[in-house]
A protein has these predicted regions:
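Metal-associated gating/positioning segment near the N- to mid-region
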Residues: 55-135, 214
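Divalent metal-dependent hydrolysis catalytic cores, especially in the metallo-beta-lactamase
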Residues: 92-97, 104-130, 143-154, 186-200, ...
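Active-site metal-binding motif and surrounding structural segment of the metallo-beta-lactamase
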Residues: 39-57
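Histidine/acidic-residue-rich catalytic or RNA/ligand-binding cores of hydrolases
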Residues: 72-74, 129, 199-202, 240-246, ...
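Active-site microenvironment of metallo-dependent hydrolases
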Residues: 1-24, 29, 39, 90-92, ...
Length: 430
């Protein structure tokens, strides 16, 4: 592998109190950050890359990804997708699975090209996420580091039941499903505890508790026994309480919290993963833009407000908050994670510095990989991005990265295929 020296750049190292550092260069050896040294130090045997005053940051970490879908917006007058039926068709055809896997590889690569060097998937088709992870780890294909969730666990009638999540009807079935998922090589286990906006037909349904507490407890116990952390889809106060009381490690999305729930977060060492992106189009777009039913707009607002209130309350209480954008949901494309950072700053009230830390070293800590990535420090994986302006001043500068490095592999002038009409719609609500 090549060895590089990045010079004439301004370093934002991803640590909690990061500030622009000049006069230093970064030496990359194989897949590691070998050292950070004064710019006048002699170097040899390396390709020297002149950053010409650009900013170099740790690669972003997206904690809530669905590789199974593109994120394209729905078409007008289109019937809602029957995901369970679609999954049945996909799982029966080897040819369709082959084509689908190629698409998923492409989505993973798009994440990388946009500056996301690590993704955490939380609900996918069969074992495809882990297979793609392994192909990347074996350097058969190029992509971000993947922490794979594979298929999740739901209940009959629950969120994405029968598609990207199996259906458990009892605590013992939940244990069986967890063991079956574990046999496919995931990095964690995903549960679907409440309903969601996309499968709700009545106002308030996204937060309806679907998974009984005893099933949540059984699934968490089995996952923990096998060494896996548990992430759970939760969009109501009742769901948050059930999740925390029964062993969930990360509450994906969230809802309004009371003091007792905050106490549970602290006692259990749990954290929320803030995902404003998927709720925003439903909440703020005109129905002529979102092509959603009126009830989805109302539910989108309920969910968006709950996610923001959850993240804000946890942040104010000193509970670490993670960031993910639920990519794959309508309007949430695989190159737009930077928007979630902007929303976290705008709606939750975090400073740009805190937001950058959250999306890099903070997220790495929640994912259990802070010793490997998330900051520009000697010995860590060479996962870096370069942008022309200072993201501490304006987070939207993360929209366009001029260079990406993942595990020492350098990508110059990375390109993504954008959907301009979607970007224009989202830009109007920034």
């Amino acid at each position: 592998m090549m060895q590089y020296v990045l010079k004439n750049g301004i370093i934002l190292d991803g640590t909690e109190n990061m500030k622009p550092v000049t006069g230093h260069m970064i030496r990359i050896e194989n897949d590691r950050i070998a050292e950070i040294l004064p710019e006048d130090s002699p170097v040899s045997g390396c390709e020297v890359i002149d950053l010409k005053g650009a900013y170099v940051l740790p690669g972003l970490i997206n904690l809530h990804v669905h590789l199974a879908t593109s994120g394209k917006p729905p078409r007008a007058n289109k019937k809602p997708t029957n995901y369970k039926r679609l999954f049945q068709i996909l799982s029966r055809s080897r040819l369709v699975k082959f084509v689908l896997k190629r698409m998923l590889r492409g989505y993973a690569r798009t994440e990388l090209m946009s500056g996301v060097t690590t993704i955490r998937t939380v609900g996918g088709i069969l074992d495809m996420d882990a297979r793609i992870r392994d192909e990347i780890n074996e350097r058969k294909i190029q992509g971000p580091r993947i922490l794979a969730g594979n298929t999740g666990v739901s209940v009959p009638g629950g969120h994405f039941a029968g598609s990207i999540a199996t259906e458990a009807e009892s605590p013992e079935q939940a244990r069986v499903h967890v063991r079956q998922i574990a046999s496919t090589g995931p990095d964690h286990i995903k549960l679907m505890i409440t309903g969601g906006v996309m499968d709700a037909s009545e106002e308030g349904e996204p937060g309806v508790l679907r998974m009984p507490p005893e099933i949540v407890k059984a699934a968490c116990e089995e996952a923990h026994r096998m060494g896996y952390k548990v992430a759970a889809h939760v969009e109501s106060p009742e769901g948050v309480r059930v999740a925390l009381e029964n062993g969930v490690d990360t509450v994906e999305h969230g809802a309004k919290l009371d003091d007792d729930m905050l106490r549970l977060f602290k006692e259990r060492g749990a954290s929320p993963v803030c995902t404003i992106s998927p709720a925003l189009p439903y909440a703020v777009f005109d129905l002529s833009e979102s092509h959603a039913a009126p009830v989805a707009k109302k539910n989108g607002r309920i969910v968006m407000d709950g996610i923001i209130e959850c993240a804000r309350a946890c942040r104010d209480s000193g509970i670490p908050v993670g960031l993910g954008n639920d990519v794959g949901c309508p309007f949430i494309l695989h190159y737009n994670f930077w928007r979630e950072l902007y929303y976290y700053h705008k709606y939750v009230g975090a400073s740009n510095r805190e937001t950058l830390y959250t999306a890099t070293l903070g997220n790495a800590g929640l994912a259990g990989i802070a010793g490997e990535t998330g900051s520009i420090e000697k010995g860590k994986s060479a996962d870096l991005i370069v942008v022309k302006q200072n993201a501490l001043d304006d987070l939207t500068d993360l929209r366009n990265v001029s260079m990406v490095m993942v595990r020492g592999d350098l990508i110059r002038n990375p390109k993504v295929k954008r959907m301009k009409h979607v970007d224009d719609m989202l830009d109007r609500y920034m």
